[in-house]
């Protein structure tokens, strides 16, 4: 009788809270994990959340600058209800980036560690092994030097669209992309972590209600770039079935390099390591503490584009390389040969990619700097190698982008439009064409909206800034206060597009604006307060750069667009 009463009390408790009375426990191939349930106000579907599930061994000691290894098994029920540490990076900058980009209402203080190969899972609470829901694997951005999985709460996307959301982490900066260009440290460790996470998903996600045969990889900025790398990589074949690159593709020149030796030597010199051989450099760097490598990262001033820096003596990014493992060839060759994973692909940009966030983070062209034409040319010539364009065409480009104006504000706006086009917009169009021509179903968008919870420092005329689309994708207007009905409706529409694509390889469904496939007519979707079809994204700019670069021979050591 007593046991029966206890059962009825437990059942009543379950009904009141809307969740099962016991927290979720799931078997993985390495051991059991304990999660928690989360509910959204006004939404009947609650979500099971698992935070910090290990997908690889901690990449410490001899595993620094080495491929990730499978996690060790455990015999207990592992508690996965707290955020894992983000991968090693500057803590202040990492926290600031998290606070700027998170879709959460509350502020979460995150930790940082070299032991960071974990993933977070959000799945509808009523999942079973037979649910077979689409899986959406998120790869965060941050210039391959910053960011983490826990900035992005996947519960809204999971609850509203009945999908399993997996947010993964990968090694960053020196830990993720240090390369000597040979067998001692090939590089691309961060991309190998991404591949390892996808293997983990294939092996384990069914137990969380996911369908390993329906996996979509999606990411933004360096995450979108990483998605594009994985689309080209033979290493990731059959590990996913659809892909979405938001504001980032493999042709972003700043995130790819052919000559790794100068940066490797600079890092070794800063660390006080002998540079006699690659083996000596790698052995020495493996002995350094995490704090010592963080100091080197700080001295390198990665991502910052200060006009005071000597670009010939410094490196702004630690980049993806041709390693014969992740990438067997230059991405341009792979695209030209059409020898890649021709999965359905969404590629998108924001209307003003270099509107406010990136110039602020990179400390480039501060608003109080009065630019004239001569100074603008000098500034852009200084960073020509980063944009991947020959210096001698910059004066012509400045004429195009300043539109005949000598107004310092308009010249500054022109420079930022120039950078946004060269780094994000033109490469995205070129990659979309390559995928279309290879026979992959391709969809293209431009996001045009000003989020209500943007930083108060951001100018009101920056509509569609870098990363703005991420707020809609992860349901920020639903989680955070202050969003208008228009903004909530926009987010629900974007989540529906993304989830439809994850389900079917096609974003369209009844009740949504029609999103045309990107074919020879180059139709695409403008997403914003008014969502509508348009044609030939950035047509004038694409034609300008294509013609300009075709007239000139590339300079050595530059990766041209």
UniProtKB/Swiss-Prot annotation:
<dbReference type="InterPro" id="IPR029058">
    <property type="entry name" value="AB_hydrolase_fold"/>
</dbReference>
<comment type="subunit">
    <text>Monomer.</text>
</comment>
<feature type="disulfide bond">
    <location>
        <begin position="87"/>
        <end position="116"/>
    </location>
</feature>
<dbReference type="GO" id="GO:0016042">
    <property type="term" value="P:lipid catabolic process"/>
</dbReference>
<dbReference type="GO" id="GO:0005788">
    <property type="term" value="C:endoplasmic reticulum lumen"/>
</dbReference>
<feature type="active site" description="Acyl-ester intermediate">
    <location>
        <position position="221"/>
    </location>
</feature>
<dbReference type="GO" id="GO:0005783">
    <property type="term" value="C:endoplasmic reticulum"/>
</dbReference>
<dbReference type="InterPro" id="IPR019826">
    <property type="entry name" value="Carboxylesterase_B_AS"/>
</dbReference>
<keyword id="KW-0378">Hydrolase</keyword>
<feature type="short sequence motif" description="Prevents secretion from ER">
    <location>
        <begin position="558"/>
        <end position="561"/>
    </location>
</feature>
<keyword id="KW-0732">Signal</keyword>
<keyword id="KW-0325">Glycoprotein</keyword>
<dbReference type="InterPro" id="IPR019819">
    <property type="entry name" value="Carboxylesterase_B_CS"/>
</dbReference>
<dbReference type="GO" id="GO:0052689">
    <property type="term" value="F:carboxylic ester hydrolase activity"/>
</dbReference>
<dbReference type="GO" id="GO:0005811">
    <property type="term" value="C:lipid droplet"/>
</dbReference>
<feature type="glycosylation site" description="N-linked (GlcNAc...) asparagine">
    <location>
        <position position="79"/>
    </location>
</feature>
<keyword id="KW-0256">Endoplasmic reticulum</keyword>
<dbReference type="InterPro" id="IPR050309">
    <property type="entry name" value="Type-B_Carboxylest/Lipase"/>
</dbReference>
<dbReference type="InterPro" id="IPR002018">
    <property type="entry name" value="CarbesteraseB"/>
</dbReference>
<feature type="active site" description="Charge relay system">
    <location>
        <position position="466"/>
    </location>
</feature>
<feature type="active site" description="Charge relay system">
    <location>
        <position position="353"/>
    </location>
</feature>
<comment type="function">
    <text>Involved in the detoxification of xenobiotics and in the activation of ester and amide prodrugs.</text>
</comment>
<keyword id="KW-0719">Serine esterase</keyword>
<comment type="similarity">
    <text>Belongs to the type-B carboxylesterase/lipase family.</text>
</comment>
<dbReference type="GO" id="GO:0106435">
    <property type="term" value="F:carboxylesterase activity"/>
</dbReference>
<feature type="disulfide bond">
    <location>
        <begin position="273"/>
        <end position="284"/>
    </location>
</feature>
<dbReference type="Pfam" id="PF00135">
    <property type="entry name" value="COesterase"/>
</dbReference>
<feature type="signal peptide">
    <location>
        <begin position="1"/>
        <end position="18"/>
    </location>
</feature>
<keyword id="KW-1015">Disulfide bond</keyword>
<protein>
    <recommendedName>
        <fullName>Liver carboxylesterase B-1</fullName>
        <ecNumber>3.1.1.1</ecNumber>
    </recommendedName>
</protein>
């Amino acid at each position: 009788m007593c046991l029966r009463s206890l059962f009825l009390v437990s059942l009543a408790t379950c009904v009141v809270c809307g969740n099962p009375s016991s927290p979720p426990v799931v078997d993985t191939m390495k051991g059991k994990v304990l999660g928690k349930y989360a509910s959204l106000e006004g939404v009947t579907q609650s979500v099971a959340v698992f935070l910090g599930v290990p997908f690889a061994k901690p990449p410490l000691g001899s595993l620094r600058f080495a491929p990730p290894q499978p996690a060790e098994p455990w015999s207990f029920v592992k508690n996965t209800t707290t955020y894992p540490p983000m991968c090693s990076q500057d803590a202040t900058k990492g926290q600031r980036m998290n606070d700027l980009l998170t879709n959460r209402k509350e502020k979460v203080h995150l930790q940082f560690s070299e032991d960071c190969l974990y993933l977070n899972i959000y799945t509808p609470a009523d999942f079973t092994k037979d649910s077979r829901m689409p899986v959406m694997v998120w790869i965060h951005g941050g210039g391959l030097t910053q960011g983490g999985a826990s900035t992005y709460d996947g519960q809204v996307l999971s609850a509203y669209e009945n999908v399993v959301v997996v947010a993964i982490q990968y090694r960053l900066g020196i830990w993720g992309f240090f390369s000597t260009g040979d067998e001692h440290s090939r590089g691309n460790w961060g991309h190998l972590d991404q591949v390892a996470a996808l293997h983990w998903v294939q092996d384990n996600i069914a137990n969380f209600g996911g369908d390993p045969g329906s996996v979509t990889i999606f990411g933004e900025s360096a995450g979108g770039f990483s998605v594009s790398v994985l689309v080209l990589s033979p290493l990731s074949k059959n590990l996913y079935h659809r892909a979405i690159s938001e504001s980032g593709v493999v042709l972003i020149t700043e995130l790819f390099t052919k000559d790794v030796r100068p940066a490797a030597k600079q890092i070794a010199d800063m660390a006080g390591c002998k540079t006699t051989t690659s083996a000596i450099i790698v052995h020495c760097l493996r002995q350094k503490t995490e704090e010592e490598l963080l100091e080197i990262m700080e001295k390198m001033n990665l991502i910052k584009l200060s006009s005071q820096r000597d670009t010939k003596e410094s490196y702004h990014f630690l980049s993806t390389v041709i390693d014969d493992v992740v990438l067997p060839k230059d991405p341009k060759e792979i695209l030209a040969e059409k020898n890649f994973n021709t999965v359905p692909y969404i590629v998108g940009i924001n209307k003003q990619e270099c509107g406010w966030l990136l110039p602020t983070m990179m400390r480039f062209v501060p608003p109080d700097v009065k630019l004239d034409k001569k100074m603008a040319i000098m500034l852009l010539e200084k960073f020509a190698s980063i944009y991947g364009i020959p210096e001698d065409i910059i004066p012509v480009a400045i004429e195009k982008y300043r539109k005949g104006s000598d107004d310092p504000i308009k010249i500054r706006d022109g420079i930022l439009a120039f950078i946004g086009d060269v780094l994000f917009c033109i490469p995205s169009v070129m990659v979309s064409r390559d995928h279309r021509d290879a026979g992959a179903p391709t969809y293209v968008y431009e996001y045009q909206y000003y989020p209500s919870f943007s930083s108060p420092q951001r100018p009101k005329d920056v509509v569609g800034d870098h990363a703005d689309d991420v707020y809609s994708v992860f349901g920020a207007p639903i989680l955070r206060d202050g969003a208008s009905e228009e903004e909530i409706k926009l987010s629900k529409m974007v989540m529906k597009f993304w989830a439809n694509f994850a389900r079917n390889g096609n974003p369209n469904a009844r009740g949504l604006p029609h999103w045309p496939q990107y074919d020879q007519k180059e139709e695409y979707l403008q997403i914003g307060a008014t969502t509508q079809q348009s044609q030939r994204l950035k047509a004038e700019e694409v034609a300008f750069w294509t013609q300009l670069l075709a007239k000139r021979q590339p300079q050595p050591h530059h990766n041209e667009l």
